[in-house]
């Protein structure tokens, strides 16, 4: 059988070219559900269909939030995890110190990329001077109020207490203010207003610093003297009170809004604190970072997806369809986003927020701090005594963590 010259040349060229290059698969782990997941998957589909993918294909896996951090810790260092994962910055330092988990991305960064984000969100992605992730979305608590009970939100703590007292009737189960004040995360906004914090500038624990004691003394005043707060707060109780019109104001975040759809509510800045020389309440900000896994064999493609996920077009989808607050600062100039009162309120609140510490030692703080909060609100110890005990326990826990 004779083979034409054209066919023969084609066969030779194919042989020289070798086998077709396999499409790169970029596996991404996330913990989104509901509308957040739908918006995220829409961005992923857009990426896969675009020229930006350059032969790569992103596949996603939704991992339950409660199991997410442990799965990353167990799987990624052994090369059994994703190429990219999305999680808040509070575990960042621990994963970096553990090794072989998160790839530093300073090599990939340029001014155009770093300049797209709110500076505080980039700070959250930085550990010991090195950047390890691109900020995707942030979350903060703010003041949420029932418009039928309160014509205008308070701007100061003096105004807050005055308004809350008028709306409080413990016998009827009504309170001017309700929030999970016994939880250290929620309390941090008040603590930070006084200039307090968890660590010193040298990253040493300092839970019992005077400013932290002052913040707790103010909380005790609201609870015991002003009596504007419900006893034994819980997320279920606070949600129930607000939905029933029995709580006029709440300190909470975007996760709370889905639970109060039937209430005519407004959002406003957390008040300034008269007792702290008029400084603002400064909530902790959690930032969802997009991280490239250190063992990934496709780091270039993984970073390319991370960059796409945090660009302006993706931010618009995440904001308007996923109801998230993107770290990309340009999105807030978008007409539809700027006109959205919820997105605008959280954007305003983040201006005075502080990134939650991303040190590995932070994991040693939560339990002692929460115990201290409960001891104080249950009147079992003074703020100073409870914080002294928490400080001692945190120091001991950190020493064990570091093997000393």
Predicted regions located by residue number:
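Extracytoplasmic/periplasmic solute-binding protein
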Residues: 130-136, 141, 159-205, 220, ...
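Short helix-initiation/N-cap motifs at beta->coil->alpha
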Residues: 62-71, 90, 157-159, 230-244
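C-terminal lobe and pocket-closing loops
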Residues: 254-266, 271-371, 402-403
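Hinge/lid segment of periplasmic solute-binding proteins
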Residues: 89-140, 152, 157-163, 189, ...
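Conserved N-terminal structural module of periplasmic/extracytoplasmic solute-binding proteins
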Residues: 9-11, 22-99, 111-113, 274-278, ...
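Paired acidic/hydrophobic, glycine-rich loop segments that form the ligand-binding mouth/hinge
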Residues: 83-86, 248-253, 266
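A structural signal for short loop-to-beta-strand junctions that line the ligand-binding cleft
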Residues: 74, 82-83, 112-145, 175-176, ...
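Glycine-centered hinge/linker elements that transmit conformational signals in sensory
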Residues: 163-164, 204-231
